[in-house]
Amino acid sequence: AWKLLDLVAVAAHQGLPIESIEPRFGYEAQGVNTRAELAQAEAVLRERIRQRWMLAGVTISDPPSVYIDSEVELGQDTVLLPNTHVSGSTRIGRDCEIGPNSIVSNSQIGDRCKITASVVEDSTVEEEVEVGPFSRVRGGAHLERGVYLGTHAEVKNSRLGPGTKSAHFSFIGDADVGANVNIGAGTVTCNYDGVRKNKTTIGEGAFIGSDSMLVAPVEVGARSSTGAGSVVTKDVPSDSTVVGVPARLLPKKRDRSKKE
């Protein structure tokens, strides 16, 4: 194993030019020969990164607990709260609040977003989205403007349209969800049939009742509703309501204001 000072002898032996430089700080010339010295060198690098972003207008609460990779980009007036890790090719917009206890990795976060005690990986989050606490966004998910993802919700490889809400306890996987959809507590898109992943489509303005099971492949039409506890195994037409196990269509109420 080579040590830093060995490089002088190696260069001389190979006839390479040798020059001396004077570092600004002694620790810049510190060797890294043990795991402990590696940790010290990494700590110096992390502190430099944090200082650079704070001088650029990012607020970092409790800096020693916040980790920022060198390739990360942060918008002005964003706040990183304690125990937040931002890694990979991540870009976070302006006026965001990330943390506490959050991980954002290889993701794009728009302006004015809030991510609380949650994990966002390999995903895109547009402007004014709120995630958490205790939620996970992963695997190519795309949350469009104004999406609200509350507590204990997971989104994987899915698109959620503008203004859609999933307040708590849900799994949305391999789904295409339209705008202004309400996804009730306990909803699951049952995407895996034991062999392959299947897609769920939910139209704009739909209302998915609590504890609904959407067994993919399946489509719920625009402005349709599922009753609480429904197991949806067949496509639901637009402007319809289904209930039960398995879910069945309810007859539409006659509009008494219209003459026959």
Where in the sequence are the language-model features?
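Fold-independent oxyanion-binding glycine-rich loops
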Residues: 23-24, 35, 62-63, 70-71, ...
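Glycine-rich hexapeptide-repeat left-handed beta-helix
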Residues: 108, 114-260
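Residue-level recognition of oxygen-bearing side chains
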Residues: 3, 37, 73, 219, ...
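Conserved hydrophobic/aromatic pocket- or pore-lining residues that grip, position, or stack substrates
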Residues: 34, 78-80, 96, 158, ...
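Catalytic-core segments of class I nucleotidyltransferases/pyrophosphorylases
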Residues: 1-47, 51
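Long, charged amphipathic helices and adjacent flexible linkers at domain junctions
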Residues: 42-71
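Phosphate-binding active sites in nucleotide-utilizing proteins
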Residues: 69-114, 118
